Amino acid sequence: MDIEAYYQRIGYKNPRNKLDLESLTDIFQHQIRTVPYENLSIHCGESMELDLEAIFDQIVRRNRGGWCLQVNYLLYWALTTTGFETTMLGGFVYGSNNDKYSTGMIHLIVQVTINGRNYIVDAGFGRSYQMWQPVELISGKDQPQVPSIFRLREEGETWYLDQIRRQQHVPDQEFLNSELLEKKIYQKLYCFTLQPRTIEEFESANTYLQESPSSVFLDKSICSLQTPEGVHCLVGLTLTSRTYNYKENTDLVEFKVLTEEEVEGVLKTIFNISLGKKLVSKNGHLSFTI
């Protein structure tokens, strides 16, 4: 695997020898704006691989995206290879439907240490929950970013990542009550500890997420990509485009329902990916917000 091929894939052309916060943020933002958060392989009859070589082939060589275990594992490899001090962490995702964190460790997170300060770097949460900058590991501090305010809080040995969101304006009245819209301003995202993890510890989660009937990734075909202004999301046949802070403390969220025939073109033009197999778009009954 070639680190230069990774940098070419994300369009990063700046120096590689500066291991500071500015460079970390730059690399991170290049990845989230070029590598979609997506699970489309499942809905093309393929599996979601956790082997690094397979992930590199999928994302770098075939210009695809992946879900958190894949995109963050690739980011972990790239940052480590570049020379950053990294630690792989495991997260437990909050479910608003039952007001609980997952019992299984289903989210991979990257911690980066720079000059004695620790930062959480997560390129794999997608949608409007996606951080755009590393979040410093400080408890109780509001950390404003373009998408929202992020806040970490420490309780015992567990860290919790929360989000304070803006109001949202939906011009099309038909979608005002869409189940895809996040209704909460204050939203819990996930929790984690600082115990170092290995990729082998995520193998059962990788299997569960693509095989369990209770997995939202089996229930829905999802593709999400950050832009300089906001984020595009495709869930089933529903395409949304969010513009952050289009007016004071308000995001603009625009909806469009596609036909099956339009999906391939939208994936190519908006998300810059092409699928090798036929996609069966799906938006089942499980709760999922953009």
UniProtKB/Swiss-Prot annotation:
Substrate binds at residues 106-107. The N-terminus is blocked. GO terms for cellular component: cytoplasm. One of its GO terms (molecular function) is N-hydroxyarylamine O-acetyltransferase activity. CoA binds at residues 103-104, 208, 214, 287. It is an enzyme of class 2 (transferase). Keywords: Acyltransferase, Cytoplasm, Transferase. The keyword Hydrolase does not apply. It comes from the Eukaryota. It is found in: Cytoplasm. InterPro entries: Arylamine_N-AcTrfase, Arylamine_NAT_domain_sf, Papain-like_cys_pep_sf. Belongs to the arylamine N-acetyltransferase family. Catalyzes the N- or O-acetylation of various arylamine and heterocyclic amine substrates, and participates in the detoxification of a plethora of hydrazine and arylamine drugs. This is Arylamine N-acetyltransferase 2. It comes from Oryctolagus cuniculus (Rabbit). The lineage of its organism: Eukaryota, Metazoa, Chordata, Craniata, Vertebrata.
